[in-house]
């Protein structure tokens, strides 16, 4: 369904002058080997609320003829879960971008919203003719709004709300993926019933945040990536996932503010990266950006001074991915970099 209403709220994009994929100039020191912790205060008030995000999506839907806005289901607390769709030809390859399975990992959502705006600027002329794009921002809206059935009094962020990893029922949505669909939490259940079961998806990037102290080669990472590591996933699916990772790595690593490591992740089918690849044959990539928007452990949260580069990193990732899929250059990507990409470790917190 297409929804048409006026936007009623502020946009973080306009606040930060992030109108295009170029976003904002970021000093190289902001990421690689960047600040250890205390990188500015953690302010949730500058982030989109659920309500302002919905208004933003409706405004973009009104402006963009290529975009359709669909409600795929509801959260535990009854919030509609939105998906932005760009489908020009059912025969095109399709990519899904998923953000905020964990509610306290929001800057990837801010980047996804900027990318949606970017898709309506004309700077992707021709791209949308050759790839279908599905974007689900803020899957876990209850956790993002702190509207949960447990206490968040130990969380550290300042602002108008706290954000938590878990959904309203205190469940980690990224551990639901091995269950029967009917046994999943509502947010995961609707993702499966109304997206993964409905659309012929070829690629997916699952966007997350991690703590602030992950490093490789003595430098703090700006993000880490990983393909499906469950042994039951088809080898061709894994190889295509590695090619997807190659697109992301070769886009970000050469930039002065980018430093990418290999994520040290599990192989369980209950994790989205593995379970979705195993169940549907979708080539998936996990991207863990540096720092969270809120947490009860201080070293996990990254302050607002780092917001710009994390948003830019997300937009660059999504833009490069759709272009590589659209022109089929992803099929020629060299995956050998994975053989030498260091697996991240955690730097000791000196504070």
Residue ranges with predicted function:
Residues 92, 106-110, 115-235:
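Active-site/substrate-binding loop(s) of hydrolase catalytic cores
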Residues 65-68, 77-79, 91-94, 129-134, ...:
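Loop/turn elements at helix/coil->beta-strand transitions in domains of secreted/extracellular proteins
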């Amino acid at each position: 369904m297409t929804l048409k209403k006026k936007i009623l709220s502020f946009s973080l994009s306009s606040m930060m002058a992030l109108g295009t994929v170029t976003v904002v100039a970021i000093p190289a020191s902001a990421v690689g080997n960047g600040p250890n912790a205390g990188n500015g205060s953690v302010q949730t008030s500058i982030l989109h609320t659920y309500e302002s995000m919905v208004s933003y999506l409706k405004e973009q839907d009104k402006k963009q003829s290529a975009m359709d806005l669909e409600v795929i289901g509801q959260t535990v607390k009854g919030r509609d879960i939105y998906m932005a769709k760009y489908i020009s030809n059912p025969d095109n390859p399709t990519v899904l971008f998923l953000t905020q399975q964990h509610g306290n990992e929001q800057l990837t959502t801010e980047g996804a919203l900027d990318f949606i705006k970017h898709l309506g600027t004309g700077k992707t002329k021709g791209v949308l003719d050759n790839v279908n794009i599905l974007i689900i921002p803020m899957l876990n809206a209850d956790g993002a709004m702190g509207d949960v059935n447990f206490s968040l009094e130990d969380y550290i962020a300042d602002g108008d709300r706290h954000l938590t990893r878990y959904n309203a029922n205190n469940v980690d949505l990224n551990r639901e993926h091995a269950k029967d669909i009917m046994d999943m939490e509502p947010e995961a259940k609707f993702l499966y019933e109304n997206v993964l079961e409905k659309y012929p998806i070829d690629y997916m990037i699952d966007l997350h945040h991690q703590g602030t102290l992950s490093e490789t080669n003595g430098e703090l990472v700006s993000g880490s990536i990983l393909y499906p590591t469950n042994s039951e996933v088809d080898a061709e699916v894994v190889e295509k996932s590695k090619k997807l990772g190659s697109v992301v790595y070769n886009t970000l690593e050469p930039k002065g503010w980018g430093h990418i490591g290999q994520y040290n992740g599990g192989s369980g089918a209950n994790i989205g990266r593995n379970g979705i690849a195993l169940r549907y044959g979708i080539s998936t990539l996990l991207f863990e950006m540096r720092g969270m928007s809120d947490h009860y452990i201080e070293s996990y949260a990254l302050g607002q001074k780092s917001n710009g580069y994390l948003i830019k990193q997300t937009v660059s990732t999504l833009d490069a991915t759709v272009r590589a899929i659209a022109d089929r250059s992803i099929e020629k990507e060299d995956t050998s970099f994975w053989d030498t990409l260091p697996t991240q470790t955690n730097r000791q917190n000196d504070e």
